[in-house]
Amino acid sequence: MNVENEYLELLKSWCDGLIRLQFQKEDNPRLDGGIFCPSCMMIHGRCHDAIYPMMYLADRLKEKKYLEAAKLLFQWSGNLLCDDGSYYNDAQNDWMGITVFSVIALTHALEFHASLLTAQEKEKWEARLNRTAEWVFQTITPQFDVNINYHAACAEAMALTGMYFHREKYLKRSDEMADFCMQYISKEGLFFGEGKPRDDVSPKGCRPVDIGYNVEESLASLLSYGTIRKNKIVRDKVKHMLWVHLEFMNPDGGWDNTMGTRNYKWSYWGSRTSDGCQLAYGLLGDEEPVFSDASYRNFKLYKRCTHDGLLYGGIDYYEHGELPCVHHTFCKAKALALLLDFGAVSVTPSELPSEHLDSVKYWPVIDTYRIARGGFIATV
């Protein structure tokens, strides 16, 4: 099986798993279209991000069930849409910053696969995108007091929607947000700002750094921005940061985020609610062969952790009866769909930095040592 078919097979498995958990024909608008989470025993508000991978498969495989699932998700998402154009994170959680991720997913769905929709459906989806993108523009500014990943995602969302709607103010905002994010690079090349306050420095001189969010979300968003806007300065800085962060990938494709400021979401292959390192490393695979191998090793870890069409939170979760949260699956499905849409799923076998580590390396910005001894790697 070639690599592209491997990616397609896993994406199909995931989307089939999500569809099995999707409420359909319940004759209840609060339920119909939502995806039930067997672990959290609820419908996660962000499950409608799966619109994009469903649309990809509908287009690629010509199977109606994926298009129907995408349309139901769009319909269900209206339950969490607010008057100001934002989305609630969950029915029980009024955090609205996650709207930026929905904007990115819906833009990809329309950008690549709008031909699957009727003219009336497309108009309705674009009207929704227009509302949510405007909320992002009005709300997520450099002054918005949140973790840095939201500013990075805003740069991508504004670049995407600015191009889609031919809206100059969005493009200018994307430039502003990317420039803002470039201020959050440590001397070692680690992206910081995953904490409050973002600019805080600990008594030991440490900054809030989260490897998981960086490689799976922030750096991918900034790379996307740099590519769309042809901003070579940002793109080159992101590539350098990806090299630096790659030192924290283990040989099996897992990430060491033990020291991360948001390590409560650490799930070995990445972070619970972000989209996956496939985006950043996979999209640069042609330029940096080791990146393609890193992306593929992480992908193979996804396969090891997938059972019955759902991505489990770690290698041993299934064996111990720990049910999977669907957030893992629908977030990572977006990344696989985008790689397939871009045709960026090649792999060149290479050697990861973790396979030839120095015996001891110290990272002052996170007050952390990486130690390699006799085939073992430790983080202290």
What is each PLM-predicted segment?
Residues 1-46, 56, 60, 64-75, ...:
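Low-complexity, Ser/Thr/Pro/Gly-enriched N-terminal "stalk/linker" regions
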Residues 22, 61, 81, 113, ...:
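Alpha-helical junction/boundary sensor with strong preference for TPR arrays
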Residues 75, 79, 88, 92-139:
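Well-ordered mid-protein domain cores that form the structural environment of catalytic cofactors
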